[in-house]
A protein has these predicted regions:
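Extreme N-terminal "head/tail" segments of very large remodeling/mechanoenzyme assemblies
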Residues: 1-118
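A short, sequence-level motif marking secondary-structure junctions
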Residues: 103-108, 123-129
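Conserved small/polar residues in nucleotide/adenosyl-binding loops
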Residues: 138-140
């Protein structure tokens, strides 16, 4: 079983230049709720536009190099800052720690096993083949 430990994002979709983190390592279950302050933050129960889908897209982007939804990679970069997008996913499988760092503008692709960086190919182009090979080996 895979245990997602944490996810950090910067300049990804609606997340700006200040790094935001979601820690999944606290309990067996993580519930993500949001309060849309743009709509007054009242008791109407409005949960749209608070970043829940951004979390799912960031998980997909970290693992597979593309959002789960049909968004082009360049459109994942926060439009206000237009650079420095970085998504970091830290997870564990069978007692082994893994970390994937993936970003654009500039392109970043790093893969770590037990905090040891693995050699990547064509990192400057954000090529995900080697990362996908590693992920396939651990059955993700």
């Amino acid at each position: 079983m895979i245990k997602i430990k944490d996810l950090t994002v910067r300049n990804f979709m609606s997340v700006g230049n200040q790094t935001q983190a979601v820690n999944f390592n606290r309990e067996q279950l993580t519930l993500v709720l949001g309060e849309n302050l743009d709509q007054g933050g009242d008791d109407s129960g409005s949960r749209n536009g608070t970043g829940k889908t951004t979390i799912i897209n960031a998980l997909s982007y970290a693992l597979y190099g593309q959002a789960l939804t049909n968004i082009k990679r360049n459109n994942l970069i926060n439009k206000t800052n237009s650079k420095g997008m970085l998504v970091t996913l830290h997870f564990e499988k069978n007692g082994v720690d893994y970390r994937v760092e993936r970003g654009r503008s500039p392109n970043v692709l790093k893969f770590f096993v037990d905090e040891q960086e693995q050699e990547m190919t064509d990192e400057s182009q954000g090529d995900s083949r080697k990362t996908q090979e590693y992920l396939s080996l651990i059955h993700i």
